């Protein structure tokens, strides 16, 4: 997987995937390998491809992403991004990561280590990155849980994509932390 590709602890890895099992596996795979996930929205509209490339190139360059995990269908976009991002060395699918085998050793983590980088949409300018440490993330999840009195009997329902901070933190990681059930829906249904 990522360690075999030379991923160093704290190195940024982009995830350009829709909400799916592959997203779950990729996000935690990056964390377990000691990397830093960088969520990106996948391309959806050809009419907005130039804007997509501009925003994503800015994010990938700013984060220093070395590996980008994406759908096989999005590889042409990923290759264009690779030509615009000097740090980007490898483009992989989630299936390539899964077929690489298990993790032999796990780098140690501290509460102050970066859990992931969340970027703004960039709708009014260049996307800006927010560093979330493991401690920040857990504090945020606990605060949200206290506000709604969340526990393991709750069923979390979300249509928000996992590359969105509320979909990722509030829905998925929140339900995981509180051992609640998570039901994911398409925003189109």
Task: Report residues per predicted region.
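Conserved pre-ATP/AMP-binding loop-to-beta segment of ANL
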Residues: 92, 100-126, 131, 136, ...
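Short hydrophobic alpha-helical segments of the AMP-binding
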Residues: 26-31, 37, 60, 137, ...
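Conserved G/P- and acidic residue-centered "switch" motifs that form tight phosphate/ATP-binding loops
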Residues: 34, 123, 179
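Conserved ATP-dependent adenylate/AMP-binding module captured primarily in the ANL superfamily
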Residues: 39-70, 76-79, 100-101, 140-157, ...
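Conserved AMP-binding/adenylate-forming
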Residues: 1-47, 159-162
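Residue-level detector of anion-binding/catalytic polar loops
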Residues: 36, 66, 181-182
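Conserved AMP-binding/adenylation subdomain of ANL enzymes
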Residues: 138-155, 165-189
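Nucleotide 5′-phosphate-binding alpha/beta core
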Residues: 4, 31, 54-113
């Amino acid at each position: 997987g990522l360690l075999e590709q030379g991923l160093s602890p704290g190195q940024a890895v982009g995830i350009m995937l829709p909400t799916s099992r592959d997203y779950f596996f990729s996000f935690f795979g990056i964390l377990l390998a000691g990397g830093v996930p960088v969520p990106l929205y996948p391309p959806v509209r050809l009419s907005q491809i130039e804007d997509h490339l501009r925003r994503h190139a800015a994010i990938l360059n700013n984060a220093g992403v070395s590996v980008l995990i994406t759908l096989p269908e999005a590889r042409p976009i990923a290759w264009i991004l690779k030509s615009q991002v000097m740090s980007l060395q490898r483009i992989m699918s989630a299936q390539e990561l899964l077929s690489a085998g298990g993790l032999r050793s796990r780098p140690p983590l501290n509460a102050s280590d970066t859990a992931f980088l969340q970027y703004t949409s960039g709708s009014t300018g260049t996307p800006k990155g927010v560093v979330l440490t493991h401690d920040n993330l857990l504090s945020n999840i606990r605060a949200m849980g206290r506000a709604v009195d969340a526990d393991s009997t709750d069923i979390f329902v979300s249509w928000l994509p996992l590359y969105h901070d509320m979909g990722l933190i509030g829905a998925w990681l929140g339900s995981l932390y509180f051992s609640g059930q998570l039901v994911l829906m398409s925003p189109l249904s």
